[in-house]
Amino acid sequence: MTLPVIYGELAPWFHLLTPPEHYEDDAAAVMGFLRERVEGRLETLLELGSGGGNTASHLRRDLRVTLTDLSRPMLDLSETINPGVEHLVGDMRTLRLGRTFDAVLIHDAICYMTSETDLRAAMTTAFEHLRPGGAAVLMPDHVRETLEPATDHGGEDDPPQADGRPGRGLRYLEWTTDPDPADSTYQVDYAVLVRHADGSVEVHHDRHVEGLFSRQTWLDLLAGVGFETWTAVDAYQRDVFIGRRPA
């Protein structure tokens, strides 16, 4: 899997694209789903596709977390806000750590599973890393029933430099489209401007191809792997899928 520019060359800028403090509500929602569905203790969590560690920076207040991602640069960034937390490079489709956890989280990184085969593989990884009674939370950005063309924009700045000049800055435009409604993908194009501390500015185009599946497909695949299944909706009206490994 080729890494998007945002997770490779631009990884050191990621917290200006999406700041960790914006993920406190997501983390609270994850904890709520887990407390409702995990049987027994809830102390450890494995995150697959943890990226810059934004959600984990809040979850680790309550849980002992292990973070995995395909991108070493993203894990390096995560370590700056999650010191002392275990960080491991790994592919959510094939990772096998040889141990189990009370919970598994796959946040929006699950969007990069663009076929049912890949999605099933990621779900199997989650199942294999759960103890009996443990639960997994999967949080795609879209399901087939909810995807609509959309645009978004944002970005943040670092604090000013010691001499008063602006620090680094980033701004982005995000454009979500579905070029072929008959297939299992949609695409998100980013136009990203980054301003270096010396004032120079670069422009990047980054296309993300992401998976799109119906709610029933999600539930059928989870059940096929062996999960007991539930659905929920988060504060942003996004579908959330929850699976528990039978005790």
Q: Model-predicted segments: where are they?
A:
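A short SAM/SAH-binding and catalytic strip from SAM-dependent methyltransferases
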Residues: D102-D118
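A short acidic, Gly/Pro-enriched loop at the edge of an enzyme's catalytic core
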Residues: T94-V104
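SAM-dependent methyltransferase
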Residues: V137-T217
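A short glycine-rich, Lys/Arg-flanked "PGG" loop and its adjoining helix->strand segment in the class I
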Residues: R120-P132
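Class I SAM-dependent methyltransferase SAM/SAH-binding core
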Residues: T44-L46, G51-T94
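Conserved class I S-adenosyl-L-methionine
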Residues: M1-E43
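C-terminal lobe and adjacent flexible extensions of AdoMet/dcAdoMet transferase-like proteins
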Residues: V209-A247
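A generic alpha-to-beta junction signature in SAM-dependent methyltransferases
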Residues: V38-E39, L59, L130
